[in-house]
Protein backbone atom coordinates (compact mmCIF):
# COMPACT_ATOMS: atom_id res chain seq x y z
CA UNK A 1 0.00 0.00 0.00
CA UNK A 2 1.20 3.50 -0.84
CA UNK A 3 0.44 6.47 1.42
CA UNK A 4 1.43 9.89 0.13
CA UNK A 5 2.58 12.37 2.73
CA UNK A 6 0.89 15.14 0.76
CA UNK A 7 -2.44 13.47 1.57
CA UNK A 8 -1.69 12.08 5.04
CA UNK A 9 -3.44 13.68 8.01
CA UNK A 10 -0.20 14.70 9.70
CA UNK A 11 1.39 17.77 11.19
CA UNK A 12 4.85 17.50 12.74
CA UNK A 13 6.10 19.96 15.35
CA UNK A 14 9.59 21.34 15.76
CA UNK A 15 9.29 22.10 19.49
CA UNK A 16 8.53 19.81 22.41
CA UNK A 17 5.08 20.21 23.99
CA UNK A 18 5.24 22.25 27.18
CA UNK A 19 3.71 19.52 29.36
CA UNK A 20 5.94 16.69 28.10
CA UNK A 21 8.34 15.18 30.65
CA UNK A 22 9.72 12.04 29.00
CA UNK A 23 11.14 11.39 25.51
CA UNK A 24 8.30 9.16 24.31
CA UNK A 25 5.72 11.83 25.16
CA UNK A 26 7.70 14.55 23.41
CA UNK A 27 8.36 12.54 20.27
CA UNK A 28 4.92 10.97 19.85
CA UNK A 29 3.35 14.43 20.00
CA UNK A 30 5.99 16.13 17.85
CA UNK A 31 5.75 13.39 15.22
CA UNK A 32 1.97 13.67 15.06
CA UNK A 33 1.19 10.20 16.40
CA UNK A 34 -1.03 11.38 19.27
CA UNK A 35 -2.62 14.60 20.49
CA UNK A 36 -3.66 15.55 24.02
CA UNK A 37 -7.37 16.15 24.61
CA UNK A 38 -7.37 16.43 28.41
CA UNK A 39 -5.07 15.32 31.25
CA UNK A 40 -4.45 11.62 30.66
CA UNK A 41 -6.67 11.51 27.55
CA UNK A 42 -5.22 11.33 24.04
CA UNK A 43 -6.42 11.08 20.45
CA UNK A 44 -4.70 8.58 18.18
CA UNK A 45 -3.90 10.06 14.78
CA UNK A 46 -3.24 7.94 11.64
CA UNK A 47 0.41 7.08 12.28
CA UNK A 48 -0.14 6.39 15.96
CA UNK A 49 -3.16 4.24 15.25
CA UNK A 50 -1.18 2.16 12.77
CA UNK A 51 1.43 1.41 15.45
CA UNK A 52 -1.28 0.64 18.01
CA UNK A 53 -3.02 -1.76 15.63
CA UNK A 54 0.25 -3.56 14.89
CA UNK A 55 0.89 -4.04 18.60
CA UNK A 56 -2.65 -5.39 18.93
CA UNK A 57 -2.02 -7.80 16.04
CA UNK A 58 1.06 -9.26 17.74
CA UNK A 59 -0.80 -9.63 21.03
CA UNK A 60 -3.82 -11.16 19.32
CA UNK A 61 -1.72 -13.67 17.37
CA UNK A 62 0.04 -14.95 20.48
CA UNK A 63 -3.17 -15.12 22.50
CA UNK A 64 -4.83 -17.12 19.75
CA UNK A 65 -1.79 -19.40 19.63
CA UNK A 66 -2.41 -20.55 23.23
CA UNK A 67 -6.08 -21.17 22.58
CA UNK A 68 -7.47 -17.84 23.73
CA UNK A 69 -10.82 -16.80 22.29
CA UNK A 70 -11.50 -13.12 21.75
CA UNK A 71 -14.72 -11.54 22.95
CA UNK A 72 -15.75 -7.98 23.73
CA UNK A 73 -17.50 -6.95 26.92
CA UNK A 74 -18.92 -3.50 27.63
CA UNK A 75 -16.78 -0.79 29.18
CA UNK A 76 -19.87 0.66 30.89
CA UNK A 77 -20.55 -1.69 33.79
CA UNK A 78 -23.22 -1.92 36.51
CA UNK A 79 -22.30 -1.45 40.14
CA UNK A 80 -23.70 -4.70 41.53
CA UNK A 81 -20.97 -7.17 40.46
CA UNK A 82 -18.29 -4.88 41.86
CA UNK A 83 -20.21 -4.55 45.11
CA UNK A 84 -20.30 -8.34 45.33
CA UNK A 85 -16.49 -8.50 45.24
CA UNK A 86 -16.12 -5.30 47.32
CA UNK A 87 -14.07 -3.67 44.57
CA UNK A 88 -16.59 -0.84 44.22
CA UNK A 89 -15.09 0.30 47.53
CA UNK A 90 -11.56 -1.15 47.25
CA UNK A 91 -10.77 0.75 44.05
CA UNK A 92 -11.45 4.00 45.87
CA UNK A 93 -11.09 7.19 43.87
CA UNK A 94 -9.48 5.46 40.88
CA UNK A 95 -12.91 4.34 39.61
CA UNK A 96 -14.84 6.50 37.17
CA UNK A 97 -18.35 6.32 38.63
CA UNK A 98 -21.54 7.60 37.05
CA UNK A 99 -25.27 7.04 37.16
CA UNK A 100 -27.99 6.93 34.54
CA UNK A 101 -31.09 9.10 34.38
CA UNK A 102 -32.88 6.71 36.73
CA UNK A 103 -30.17 6.99 39.35
CA UNK A 104 -28.62 3.55 38.86
CA UNK A 105 -24.87 3.41 39.54
CA UNK A 106 -22.36 2.44 36.87
CA UNK A 107 -18.61 2.52 36.40
CA UNK A 108 -16.20 2.65 33.49
CA UNK A 109 -14.32 -0.63 33.60
CA UNK A 110 -10.75 -0.63 34.93
CA UNK A 111 -10.58 -4.42 34.57
CA UNK A 112 -13.15 -7.15 33.99
CA UNK A 113 -12.71 -10.11 36.36
CA UNK A 114 -16.31 -9.84 37.57
CA UNK A 115 -17.87 -9.73 34.12
CA UNK A 116 -15.80 -12.58 32.73
CA UNK A 117 -16.70 -14.76 35.72
CA UNK A 118 -20.39 -13.99 35.21
CA UNK A 119 -20.10 -14.61 31.47
CA UNK A 120 -18.64 -18.09 31.97
CA UNK A 121 -21.20 -18.83 34.70
CA UNK A 122 -23.98 -17.96 32.27
CA UNK A 123 -22.70 -20.10 29.41
CA UNK A 124 -20.99 -23.20 30.84
CA UNK A 125 -22.31 -25.89 33.18
CA UNK A 126 -20.20 -29.01 32.54
CA UNK A 127 -16.61 -30.03 33.19
CA UNK A 128 -16.48 -31.03 29.52
CA UNK A 129 -16.51 -27.32 28.59
CA UNK A 130 -13.27 -26.65 30.46
CA UNK A 131 -10.59 -25.37 30.36
CA UNK A 132 -11.29 -22.12 28.57
CA UNK A 133 -9.36 -18.87 28.10
CA UNK A 134 -11.19 -15.72 26.99
CA UNK A 135 -9.65 -12.35 26.21
CA UNK A 136 -10.44 -8.90 24.92
CA UNK A 137 -8.49 -5.90 23.67
CA UNK A 138 -10.43 -2.94 24.96
CA UNK A 139 -10.25 0.61 26.26
CA UNK A 140 -10.06 0.79 30.06
CA UNK A 141 -10.55 3.71 32.42
CA UNK A 142 -8.87 4.68 35.69
CA UNK A 143 -9.11 8.08 37.33
CA UNK A 144 -5.39 8.57 37.88
CA UNK A 145 -4.71 11.27 40.43
CA UNK A 146 -1.68 12.49 38.49
CA UNK A 147 -1.74 11.33 34.87
CA UNK A 148 1.70 11.88 33.40
CA UNK A 149 4.16 10.97 30.67
CA UNK A 150 1.62 11.06 27.86
CA UNK A 151 0.17 7.65 27.07
CA UNK A 152 2.46 5.93 29.57
CA UNK A 153 0.11 6.77 32.42
CA UNK A 154 -3.28 7.92 31.23
CA UNK A 155 -6.86 7.85 32.39
CA UNK A 156 -7.99 6.08 29.23
CA UNK A 157 -5.86 3.29 27.79
CA UNK A 158 -6.03 0.16 25.66
CA UNK A 159 -5.42 -3.11 27.46
CA UNK A 160 -5.48 -6.78 26.61
CA UNK A 161 -7.04 -8.63 29.51
CA UNK A 162 -7.48 -12.39 29.43
CA UNK A 163 -8.95 -14.80 31.94
CA UNK A 164 -8.46 -18.53 32.28
CA UNK A 165 -10.99 -20.89 33.86
CA UNK A 166 -9.86 -24.32 34.99
CA UNK A 167 -11.13 -27.23 37.04
CA UNK A 168 -8.20 -27.42 39.45
CA UNK A 169 -4.94 -25.81 40.50
CA UNK A 170 -2.87 -27.91 38.11
CA UNK A 171 -4.98 -26.56 35.26
CA UNK A 172 -4.54 -23.00 36.54
CA UNK A 173 -0.77 -23.42 36.68
CA UNK A 174 -0.76 -24.71 33.10
CA UNK A 175 -2.82 -21.72 31.93
CA UNK A 176 -0.59 -19.35 33.88
CA UNK A 177 2.58 -20.80 32.36
CA UNK A 178 1.07 -20.68 28.87
CA UNK A 179 0.38 -16.98 29.32
CA UNK A 180 3.83 -16.39 30.78
CA UNK A 181 5.46 -17.94 27.72
CA UNK A 182 3.10 -16.10 25.35
CA UNK A 183 3.99 -12.79 26.99
CA UNK A 184 7.68 -13.47 26.49
CA UNK A 185 7.05 -14.15 22.79
CA UNK A 186 4.99 -10.97 22.50
CA UNK A 187 7.61 -8.72 24.04
CA UNK A 188 10.41 -10.42 22.12
CA UNK A 189 8.54 -9.85 18.84
CA UNK A 190 8.01 -6.21 19.76
CA UNK A 191 11.71 -5.75 20.45
CA UNK A 192 11.21 -4.67 24.06
CA UNK A 193 13.89 -5.15 26.71
CA UNK A 194 12.15 -6.40 29.83
CA UNK A 195 12.53 -8.34 33.06
CA UNK A 196 10.05 -10.66 34.81
CA UNK A 197 9.70 -9.93 38.52
CA UNK A 198 7.75 -11.35 41.43
CA UNK A 199 4.88 -9.03 42.33
CA UNK A 200 2.03 -8.49 44.75
CA UNK A 201 -1.58 -9.14 43.80
CA UNK A 202 -3.13 -5.99 45.26
CA UNK A 203 -6.84 -5.43 44.74
CA UNK A 204 -6.88 -8.23 42.17
CA UNK A 205 -6.49 -10.88 44.84
CA UNK A 206 -5.05 -14.34 44.36
CA UNK A 207 -1.70 -15.92 45.09
CA UNK A 208 1.13 -16.09 42.56
CA UNK A 209 1.72 -12.90 40.61
CA UNK A 210 4.45 -11.66 38.28
CA UNK A 211 5.06 -8.41 36.47
CA UNK A 212 6.79 -7.79 33.17
CA UNK A 213 8.74 -4.55 33.46
CA UNK A 214 10.36 -2.73 30.55
CA UNK A 215 13.78 -1.37 31.41
CA UNK A 216 13.54 2.42 31.56
CA UNK A 217 15.02 5.20 33.70
CA UNK A 218 11.63 6.98 33.54
CA UNK A 219 9.75 3.98 34.93
CA UNK A 220 7.56 4.46 38.00
CA UNK A 221 8.16 0.93 39.26
CA UNK A 222 11.25 0.11 41.27
CA UNK A 223 12.41 -3.47 41.16
CA UNK A 224 15.43 -5.29 42.48
CA UNK A 225 17.54 -7.97 40.89
CA UNK A 226 20.22 -10.30 42.18
CA UNK A 227 22.82 -10.62 39.44
CA UNK A 228 24.31 -13.72 41.05
CA UNK A 229 21.11 -15.78 41.14
CA UNK A 230 18.69 -14.08 38.74
CA UNK A 231 16.14 -13.38 41.48
CA UNK A 232 14.01 -10.36 40.57
CA UNK A 233 11.03 -8.76 42.28
CA UNK A 234 8.99 -5.61 42.32
CA UNK A 235 10.11 -3.69 45.38
CA UNK A 236 6.66 -4.17 46.94
CA UNK A 237 7.09 -7.95 46.73
CA UNK A 238 10.58 -8.27 48.22
CA UNK A 239 10.57 -10.50 51.29
CA UNK A 240 13.09 -9.46 53.94
CA UNK A 241 15.22 -12.35 55.23
CA UNK A 242 14.57 -12.75 58.95
CA UNK A 243 17.48 -13.36 61.34
CA UNK A 244 17.77 -16.60 63.26
CA UNK A 245 16.20 -16.37 66.74
CA UNK A 246 18.74 -15.37 69.39
CA UNK A 247 18.83 -16.71 72.96
CA UNK A 248 17.11 -14.55 75.55
CA UNK A 249 18.09 -16.18 78.84
CA UNK A 250 20.75 -14.35 80.83
CA UNK A 251 20.61 -11.17 78.77
CA UNK A 252 20.86 -7.84 80.67
CA UNK A 253 17.59 -6.16 81.55
CA UNK A 254 16.46 -3.20 79.50
CA UNK A 255 17.31 0.18 81.05
CA UNK A 256 15.41 3.45 80.65
CA UNK A 257 17.63 6.52 80.19
CA UNK A 258 16.99 10.23 80.26
CA UNK A 259 17.61 11.37 76.69
CA UNK A 260 16.63 15.04 76.53
CA UNK A 261 16.11 16.60 73.11
CA UNK A 262 16.45 13.35 71.16
CA UNK A 263 13.24 13.11 69.10
CA UNK A 264 15.08 12.00 65.95
CA UNK A 265 17.14 8.93 65.15
CA UNK A 266 20.22 11.07 64.45
CA UNK A 267 19.99 12.86 67.80
CA UNK A 268 19.39 9.55 69.60
CA UNK A 269 22.50 7.97 68.06
CA UNK A 270 24.55 11.03 68.98
CA UNK A 271 23.35 10.78 72.58
CA UNK A 272 24.05 7.02 72.76
CA UNK A 273 27.65 7.39 71.67
CA UNK A 274 28.24 10.36 73.97
CA UNK A 275 26.62 8.58 76.95
CA UNK A 276 28.87 5.52 76.81
CA UNK A 277 26.31 3.14 75.34
CA UNK A 278 28.89 2.28 72.69
CA UNK A 279 30.96 0.54 75.38
CA UNK A 280 28.05 -1.81 76.08
CA UNK A 281 27.83 -2.63 72.37
CA UNK A 282 31.59 -2.98 71.95
CA UNK A 283 31.40 -0.66 68.96
CA UNK A 284 29.91 2.71 67.99
CA UNK A 285 26.11 2.84 68.07
CA UNK A 286 24.50 3.32 64.65
CA UNK A 287 20.99 4.04 63.46
CA UNK A 288 20.61 0.32 62.71
CA UNK A 289 20.68 -0.32 66.48
CA UNK A 290 17.58 1.80 67.03
CA UNK A 291 13.94 0.88 66.54
CA UNK A 292 11.85 3.55 64.84
CA UNK A 293 8.12 3.39 65.55
CA UNK A 294 5.96 5.02 62.90
CA UNK A 295 2.26 5.56 63.55
CA UNK A 296 -0.25 5.31 60.71
CA UNK A 297 -4.00 5.19 60.41
CA UNK A 298 -5.55 2.50 58.21
CA UNK A 299 -8.89 3.19 56.59
CA UNK A 300 -10.54 -0.13 55.79
CA UNK A 301 -13.02 -0.70 52.93
CA UNK A 302 -15.92 -0.71 55.39
CA UNK A 303 -15.00 2.84 56.40
CA UNK A 304 -13.61 1.93 59.81
CA UNK A 305 -10.23 3.31 60.84
CA UNK A 306 -7.48 1.75 62.91
CA UNK A 307 -4.30 3.21 64.38
CA UNK A 308 -1.34 0.90 63.82
CA UNK A 309 2.30 1.08 64.93
CA UNK A 310 5.00 0.11 62.42
CA UNK A 311 8.43 -0.76 63.85
CA UNK A 312 11.45 -0.59 61.52
CA UNK A 313 15.20 -0.38 62.11
CA UNK A 314 16.18 3.25 62.56
CA UNK A 315 18.49 3.27 59.55
CA UNK A 316 15.52 2.51 57.26
CA UNK A 317 12.74 4.74 56.01
CA UNK A 318 9.22 3.44 55.59
CA UNK A 319 8.54 2.86 51.88
CA UNK A 320 5.02 4.12 51.17
CA UNK A 321 4.51 1.69 48.28
CA UNK A 322 5.64 -1.33 50.29
CA UNK A 323 3.51 -0.26 53.23
CA UNK A 324 0.50 0.29 50.98
CA UNK A 325 0.91 -3.10 49.32
CA UNK A 326 1.22 -4.81 52.71
CA UNK A 327 -2.03 -3.41 54.10
CA UNK A 328 -4.23 -3.52 50.97
CA UNK A 329 -7.13 -3.09 50.59
CA UNK A 330 -6.89 -0.63 53.48
CA UNK A 331 -5.67 2.87 52.68
CA UNK A 332 -2.87 4.49 54.66
CA UNK A 333 -3.33 7.90 56.28
CA UNK A 334 -1.10 9.95 58.55
CA UNK A 335 -2.15 10.64 62.10
CA UNK A 336 -3.51 14.12 62.76
CA UNK A 337 -2.92 16.32 65.78
CA UNK A 338 -6.40 15.31 66.89
CA UNK A 339 -5.37 11.64 66.82
CA UNK A 340 -2.38 12.35 69.05
CA UNK A 341 -4.52 14.43 71.38
CA UNK A 342 -7.02 11.58 71.68
CA UNK A 343 -4.21 9.12 72.46
CA UNK A 344 -1.90 10.89 74.94
CA UNK A 345 0.22 7.75 75.39
CA UNK A 346 1.59 8.44 71.89
CA UNK A 347 4.51 10.73 72.71
CA UNK A 348 5.93 12.14 69.50
CA UNK A 349 9.60 11.27 69.10
CA UNK A 350 9.58 8.85 72.03
CA UNK A 351 7.03 6.17 71.09
CA UNK A 352 7.92 2.63 72.17
CA UNK A 353 6.32 -0.82 71.86
CA UNK A 354 5.20 -1.01 75.49
CA UNK A 355 2.57 1.75 75.43
CA UNK A 356 1.23 0.55 72.10
CA UNK A 357 0.56 -2.93 73.39
CA UNK A 358 -0.77 -1.77 76.75
CA UNK A 359 -3.33 0.39 74.92
CA UNK A 360 -4.44 -2.20 72.38
CA UNK A 361 -2.66 -0.66 69.39
CA UNK A 362 -1.70 -3.28 66.82
CA UNK A 363 2.08 -3.34 66.48
CA UNK A 364 3.70 -4.74 63.34
CA UNK A 365 7.45 -4.91 62.89
CA UNK A 366 10.02 -5.38 60.17
CA UNK A 367 11.18 -9.03 59.88
CA UNK A 368 14.62 -7.93 61.10
CA UNK A 369 13.05 -7.33 64.51
CA UNK A 370 13.32 -11.03 65.30
CA UNK A 371 13.20 -12.89 68.57
CA UNK A 372 16.18 -12.02 70.72
CA UNK A 373 17.18 -8.86 68.86
CA UNK A 374 17.94 -5.92 71.17
CA UNK A 375 17.03 -2.32 70.43
CA UNK A 376 17.28 1.27 71.55
CA UNK A 377 13.80 2.75 71.25
CA UNK A 378 11.30 5.12 72.80
CA UNK A 379 10.24 4.72 76.43
CA UNK A 380 6.84 6.41 75.95
CA UNK A 381 7.79 9.48 77.99
CA UNK A 382 9.14 12.84 76.82
CA UNK A 383 12.94 12.81 76.76
CA UNK A 384 13.28 9.10 77.61
CA UNK A 385 14.51 6.07 75.65
CA UNK A 386 15.10 2.48 76.64
CA UNK A 387 18.33 0.62 75.83
CA UNK A 388 18.48 -3.16 75.40
CA UNK A 389 14.78 -3.79 74.78
CA UNK A 390 14.61 -7.38 73.53
CA UNK A 391 12.00 -8.66 71.10
CA UNK A 392 10.26 -11.73 72.47
CA UNK A 393 11.11 -10.84 76.06
CA UNK A 394 10.22 -7.21 76.65
CA UNK A 395 7.67 -6.90 73.86
CA UNK A 396 5.88 -9.24 71.49
CA UNK A 397 4.84 -7.81 68.12
CA UNK A 398 1.44 -8.66 66.68
CA UNK A 399 3.09 -9.68 63.42
CA UNK A 400 5.58 -8.67 60.78
CA UNK A 401 5.12 -6.27 57.88
CA UNK A 402 7.14 -5.50 54.75
CA UNK A 403 7.22 -1.72 55.00
CA UNK A 404 10.89 -0.74 55.23
CA UNK A 405 12.74 0.50 52.18
CA UNK A 406 14.79 -1.94 50.11
CA UNK A 407 18.31 -0.77 49.30
CA UNK A 408 21.17 -1.66 47.00
CA UNK A 409 23.35 -4.24 48.68
CA UNK A 410 20.58 -5.82 50.76
CA UNK A 411 20.81 -9.62 50.88
CA UNK A 412 18.73 -11.40 48.26
CA UNK A 413 15.79 -13.36 49.71
CA UNK A 414 17.15 -16.49 48.03
CA UNK A 415 20.40 -16.15 49.99
CA UNK A 416 22.54 -16.24 46.85
CA UNK A 417 23.83 -12.70 46.55
CA UNK A 418 22.87 -9.06 47.02
CA UNK A 419 20.15 -6.90 45.53
CA UNK A 420 20.55 -4.12 43.00
CA UNK A 421 17.76 -1.61 42.35
CA UNK A 422 16.55 -0.56 38.90
CA UNK A 423 13.53 1.17 37.40
CA UNK A 424 11.01 -0.11 34.91
CA UNK A 425 7.62 0.44 33.29
CA UNK A 426 4.96 -2.19 33.90
CA UNK A 427 3.88 -3.66 30.55
CA UNK A 428 2.28 -6.89 31.69
CA UNK A 429 0.96 -8.52 34.85
CA UNK A 430 -0.17 -12.10 35.35
CA UNK A 431 -2.08 -13.46 38.35
CA UNK A 432 -3.15 -16.82 39.69
CA UNK A 433 -6.40 -15.43 41.06
CA UNK A 434 -7.64 -18.62 42.63
CA UNK A 435 -11.27 -18.65 43.76
CA UNK A 436 -11.87 -15.01 44.76
CA UNK A 437 -14.23 -14.25 41.88
CA UNK A 438 -15.66 -17.69 41.24
CA UNK A 439 -16.52 -17.93 44.95
CA UNK A 440 -18.14 -14.50 44.84
CA UNK A 441 -20.42 -15.50 41.96
CA UNK A 442 -20.59 -19.27 42.64
CA UNK A 443 -19.19 -20.18 39.24
CA UNK A 444 -19.65 -23.96 39.28
CA UNK A 445 -19.93 -26.71 36.70
CA UNK A 446 -20.93 -30.32 37.14
CA UNK A 447 -17.86 -32.49 37.55
CA UNK A 448 -17.24 -35.92 36.11
CA UNK A 449 -18.80 -37.46 39.23
CA UNK A 450 -21.93 -35.35 38.90
CA UNK A 451 -21.00 -33.06 41.79
CA UNK A 452 -20.44 -29.29 41.52
CA UNK A 453 -16.87 -28.14 40.85
CA UNK A 454 -15.89 -24.55 41.61
CA UNK A 455 -13.81 -23.09 38.77
CA UNK A 456 -10.42 -21.52 39.45
CA UNK A 457 -9.33 -18.36 37.63
CA UNK A 458 -6.26 -16.66 36.27
CA UNK A 459 -6.05 -13.05 35.11
CA UNK A 460 -3.51 -11.68 32.64
CA UNK A 461 -3.06 -8.10 31.41
CA UNK A 462 -0.92 -6.29 28.85
CA UNK A 463 -0.87 -2.51 28.47
CA UNK A 464 -1.32 -2.35 24.71
CA UNK A 465 -1.36 1.42 24.26
CA UNK A 466 1.39 1.76 26.85
CA UNK A 467 3.52 -0.55 24.70
CA UNK A 468 3.58 2.10 21.97
CA UNK A 469 5.15 4.58 24.39
CA UNK A 470 7.49 1.96 25.84
CA UNK A 471 8.87 1.08 22.41
CA UNK A 472 9.31 4.78 21.66
CA UNK A 473 11.02 5.23 25.02
CA UNK A 474 13.49 2.41 24.46
CA UNK A 475 14.17 2.87 20.75
CA UNK A 476 14.39 6.61 20.08
CA UNK A 477 17.54 8.64 19.50
CA UNK A 478 18.30 12.36 19.48
CA UNK A 479 16.77 12.72 16.01
CA UNK A 480 13.43 11.09 16.65
CA UNK A 481 11.55 7.81 16.79
CA UNK A 482 12.94 4.48 15.57
CA UNK A 483 10.28 1.82 15.14
CA UNK A 484 11.12 -1.89 14.99
CA UNK A 485 9.82 -3.51 11.80
CA UNK A 486 7.10 -5.40 13.71
CA UNK A 487 5.27 -2.20 14.66
CA UNK A 488 6.49 0.49 12.25
CA UNK A 489 3.59 2.36 10.62
CA UNK A 490 5.24 1.70 7.25
CA UNK A 491 7.94 -0.67 6.09
CA UNK A 492 9.81 2.00 4.17
CA UNK A 493 9.80 5.78 3.81
CA UNK A 494 10.62 7.06 0.31
CA UNK A 495 11.86 10.65 0.09
CA UNK A 496 12.13 12.64 -3.13
CA UNK A 497 15.01 15.02 -2.44
CA UNK A 498 15.20 16.56 -5.89
CA UNK A 499 12.61 18.61 -7.75
CA UNK A 500 13.93 17.27 -11.04
CA UNK A 501 11.07 15.70 -12.99
CA UNK A 502 13.15 12.65 -13.83
CA UNK A 503 13.82 12.00 -10.14
CA UNK A 504 10.13 12.35 -9.29
CA UNK A 505 9.24 9.96 -12.09
CA UNK A 506 11.87 7.54 -10.83
CA UNK A 507 10.51 7.80 -7.31
CA UNK A 508 7.05 6.90 -8.56
CA UNK A 509 8.55 3.82 -10.22
CA UNK A 510 10.41 2.76 -7.08
CA UNK A 511 7.33 3.29 -4.92
CA UNK A 512 5.18 1.28 -7.32
CA UNK A 513 7.76 -1.51 -7.29
CA UNK A 514 7.85 -1.65 -3.50
CA UNK A 515 4.07 -1.68 -3.39
CA UNK A 516 4.00 -4.55 -5.86
CA UNK A 517 6.21 -6.51 -3.44
CA UNK A 518 3.59 -6.13 -0.73
CA UNK A 519 5.35 -3.47 1.31
CA UNK A 520 3.64 -0.58 3.07
CA UNK A 521 5.24 2.57 1.66
CA UNK A 522 5.17 6.11 3.02
CA UNK A 523 5.95 8.35 0.05
CA UNK A 524 7.07 11.91 0.78
CA UNK A 525 5.90 13.54 -2.43
CA UNK A 526 5.57 17.02 -0.91
CA UNK A 527 7.17 20.09 -2.46
CA UNK A 528 8.95 20.89 0.83
CA UNK A 529 12.73 21.34 0.94
CA UNK A 530 15.01 18.29 1.25
CA UNK A 531 16.05 19.44 4.73
CA UNK A 532 12.47 19.46 5.97
CA UNK A 533 11.83 16.05 4.45
CA UNK A 534 14.94 14.52 5.99
CA UNK A 535 14.12 15.89 9.45
CA UNK A 536 10.59 14.52 9.20
CA UNK A 537 11.89 11.14 8.05
CA UNK A 538 14.15 10.96 11.10
CA UNK A 539 11.40 12.16 13.43
CA UNK A 540 8.75 9.75 12.10
CA UNK A 541 11.09 6.79 12.51
CA UNK A 542 10.39 4.24 9.76
CA UNK A 543 13.10 1.55 9.86
CA UNK A 544 14.22 2.12 6.26
CA UNK A 545 14.44 5.33 4.24
CA UNK A 546 15.01 5.45 0.49
CA UNK A 547 16.30 8.80 -0.78
CA UNK A 548 15.88 9.60 -4.46
CA UNK A 549 17.80 12.75 -5.31
CA UNK A 550 20.79 13.87 -7.27
CA UNK A 551 22.11 10.35 -7.62
CA UNK A 552 19.16 9.36 -9.76
CA UNK A 553 20.79 10.96 -12.78
CA UNK A 554 23.79 8.69 -12.19
CA UNK A 555 21.59 5.64 -11.73
CA UNK A 556 21.77 5.35 -7.92
CA UNK A 557 19.50 5.82 -4.92
CA UNK A 558 20.43 6.04 -1.24
CA UNK A 559 19.21 3.50 1.29
CA UNK A 560 19.35 4.53 4.98
CA UNK A 561 19.00 2.31 8.01
CA UNK A 562 17.20 4.37 10.67
CA UNK A 563 18.54 2.23 13.51
CA UNK A 564 22.22 2.14 12.63
CA UNK A 565 22.38 5.42 10.72
CA UNK A 566 24.27 3.66 7.95
CA UNK A 567 23.64 4.74 4.36
CA UNK A 568 24.54 3.02 1.12
CA UNK A 569 24.15 3.84 -2.54
CA UNK A 570 22.53 1.11 -4.59
CA UNK A 571 21.87 0.94 -8.34
CA UNK A 572 18.47 2.40 -9.15
CA UNK A 573 17.57 -0.69 -11.14
CA UNK A 574 18.21 -2.82 -8.05
CA UNK A 575 16.61 -0.47 -5.52
CA UNK A 576 13.37 -2.39 -5.08
CA UNK A 577 15.07 -5.78 -4.79
CA UNK A 578 17.66 -4.41 -2.35
CA UNK A 579 15.06 -2.80 -0.09
CA UNK A 580 12.94 -5.94 -0.08
CA UNK A 581 16.00 -8.05 0.77
CA UNK A 582 16.97 -5.75 3.65
CA UNK A 583 13.46 -5.68 5.10
CA UNK A 584 12.75 -9.38 4.77
CA UNK A 585 16.22 -10.46 5.77
Swiss-Prot record:
Keywords on record: Aminoacyl-tRNA synthetase, ATP-binding, Cytoplasm, Ligase, Nucleotide-binding, Protein biosynthesis
Pfam families xref list: HGTP_anticodon, tRNA-synt_2b, tRNA_edit
Under the heading InterPro entries, the entry gives: aa-tRNA-synt_IIb, aa-tRNA-synth_II, aa-tRNA-synth_II/BPL/LPL, Anticodon-bd, Anticodon-bd_dom_sf, Pro-tRNA-ligase_IIa, Pro-tRNA-synth_IIa_bac-type, Pro-tRNA-Synthase_IIa_type1
What EC number(s) does this enzyme carry?
Answer: 6.1.1.15
The UniProt entry's GO CC annotations, sorted and at most eight, read: cytosol
As for subcellular location, the record says: Cytoplasm
Could you tell me which cysteines form disulfide bridges?
none
An individual GO BP term = prolyl-tRNA aminoacylation
Main function: Catalyzes the attachment of proline to tRNA(Pro) in a two-step reaction: proline is first activated by ATP to form Pro-AMP and then transferred to the acceptor end of tRNA(Pro). As ProRS can inadvertently accommodate and process non-cognate amino acids such as alanine and cysteine, to avoid such errors it has two additional distinct editing activities against alanine. One activity is designated as 'pretransfer' editing and involves the tRNA(Pro)-independent hydrolysis of activated Ala-AMP.
Q: To which protein family does this belong?
A: Belongs to the class-II aminoacyl-tRNA synthetase family. ProS type 1 subfamily.
- Record remark on domains: Consists of three domains: the N-terminal catalytic domain, the editing domain and the C-terminal anticodon-binding domain.
Q: How does it assemble?
A: Homodimer.
- Protein name, UniProt field: Proline--tRNA ligase
Where is the organism placed in the taxonomic lineage, from the top?
Bacteria, Bacillati, Actinomycetota, Actinomycetes, Mycobacteriales
Its gene is: proS
